[in-house]
């Protein structure tokens, strides 16, 4: 922890450094993980189950080394909060090559929207406007899951 404290940037004298450090220590990271709106899929069975159990599914096919994937990730989390009628999942294409091959994913990020187990839209690339428009169309008339 002392290395972390020393590596903090110098804060303006008007800001209380100890208050800042206390706020970092109080952050409950485990709680934010549990409340995430985008769920990691670990295997093909989980993927099939997510499609079967939800009326609208938004799939984010990403790679850990992909810069645009990292850039759009916070926006995808925000969209998951804005559209509760859709179930948001993500797969790492390097971890699940059979699923990504089955879906025909050729570039990252690729977003595929399923409605009633059928693919209804695909957005290739980090295009938040196109993604939101596709989600809006898919969730139209769908009630949020309780």
Predicted regions and their residues:
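Thiol-based oxidoreductase modules, predominantly thioredoxin-like and allied folds used
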Residues: 40-42, 61, 73-98, 105
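Local sequence-structure signature of Cys/Sec-based thiol-disulfide redox active-site neighborhoods
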Residues: 48-78
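Non-catalytic, surface beta->alpha helical segment in thiol-disulfide oxidoreductase systems
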Residues: 107, 112-146
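Residue-level recognition of specific faces of alpha-helices
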Residues: 68, 75, 85, 99, ...
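Acidic phosphotransfer microenvironment of two-component signaling modules
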Residues: 45-48, 97, 129
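Structural signal for hydrophobic/aromatic residues that build the beta-strand cores
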Residues: 47, 58-59, 76, 88-91, ...
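N-terminal leader/targeting and pre-domain segments
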Residues: 2-57, 137-146
């Amino acid at each position: 922890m002392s290395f972390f404290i020393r590596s903090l940037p110098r804060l303006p004298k008007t800001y209380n450094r100890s208050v800042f450090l206390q706020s970092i220590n109080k952050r409950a990271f485990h709680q934010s993980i549990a409340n995430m709106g985008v769920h990691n899929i670990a295997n093909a069975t989980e993927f099939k189950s997510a499609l079967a159990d939800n009326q609208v599914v938004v799939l984010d096919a990403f790679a850990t080394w992909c810069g645009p994937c990292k850039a759009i990730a916070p926006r995808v989390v925000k969209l998951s909060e804005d559209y509760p009628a859709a179930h948001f999942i993500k797969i790492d294409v390097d971890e699940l090559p059979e699923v990504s091959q089955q879906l025909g994913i050729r570039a990252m990020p690729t977003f595929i929207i399923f409605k009633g187990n059928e693919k209804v839209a695909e957005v290739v690339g980090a295009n938040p406007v196109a993604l939101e428009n596709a989600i809006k169309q898919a969730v139209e008339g769908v009630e949020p899951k309780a």
